[in-house]
């Protein structure tokens, strides 16, 4: 998603995720995706976006975030590239956590409990999609009931539904009166009409109609 946050509940879980994700980023192929079919990640949209993203990373590290993986040295020299970056121990007060970055940056926050994780996520002004990876049905039920978000996944990487269901962001991730896709998407193009009728023999004309 545009603002990507990874929460490992408990240090043991967070450490495992840090190692796994950092290893995956180190293998990622970065290049011009229009010229190289093997490239997995291309540049950002323009120089302004490149500058904004790198400044956000610098601000977070200057205020306490740890660089778990820095891919800046692996990007092509030409183009508006930003290397894939994993930042650990990000504080919920940082702009990296609060704002949508729209760049290849993953933030890690380390809540001690699921309750703390949900409470922290619910401080965000956005509410597009969130996923819980867990073997616990109780944790999944709590997550789906308490998280303030429109699209939820349980053990699913990206909780974006098919067109049969609404793309249902909440809070600042929702603009307008109706969501796109699903029945709400159909209703956007629908003009409703209500007809009230009553029939009995007193309305029958002599001609029979």
What are these regions (language model features)?
Residues 56-61:
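Helical element adjacent to the flavin cofactor pocket in flavoenzyme catalytic cores
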Residues 35-41:
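Short linear capping/connector segments at secondary-structure termini
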Residues 43-54:
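Short beta-strand to alpha-helix junction loop
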Residues 30, 62-73:
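Short secondary-structure junctions
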Residues 9-12, 29, 33, 73-74, ...:
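Conserved C-terminal structural/oligomerization subdomain of aldehyde/semialdehyde dehydrogenase
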């Amino acid at each position: 998603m545009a603002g990507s946050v990874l929460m490992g509940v408990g240090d043991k879980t967070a450490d495992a995720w840090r190692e796994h994700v950092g290893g995956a980023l180190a293998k990622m192929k970065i290049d011009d995706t229009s010229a190289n079919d093997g490239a997995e990640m291309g540049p950002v949209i323009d120089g302004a976006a490149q500058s904004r993203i790198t400044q956000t990373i610098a601000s977070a590290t200057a205020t306490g975030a740890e660089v778990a993986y820095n891919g800046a040295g692996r990007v092509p020299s030409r183009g508006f590239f930003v290397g894939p970056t994993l930042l650990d121990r990000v504080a919920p007060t940082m702009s990296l956590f609060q704002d949508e970055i729209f760049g290849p940056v993953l933030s890690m926050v380390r809540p001690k409990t699921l309750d703390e994780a949900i409470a922290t996520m619910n401080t965000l002004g956005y509410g597009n999609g969130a996923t819980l990876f867990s073997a616990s049905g109780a944790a999944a039920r709590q997550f789906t009931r308490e998280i303030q978000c429109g699209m939820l996944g349980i053990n699913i990487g990206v909780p974006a539904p098919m067109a049969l269901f609404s793309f249902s962001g909440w809070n600042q991730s929702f603009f307008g009166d109706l969501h796109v896709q699903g029945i709400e998407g159909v209703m956007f193009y629908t003009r409703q009409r209500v007809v009230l009728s009553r029939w009995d023999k007193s309305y029958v004309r002599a001609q029979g109609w």
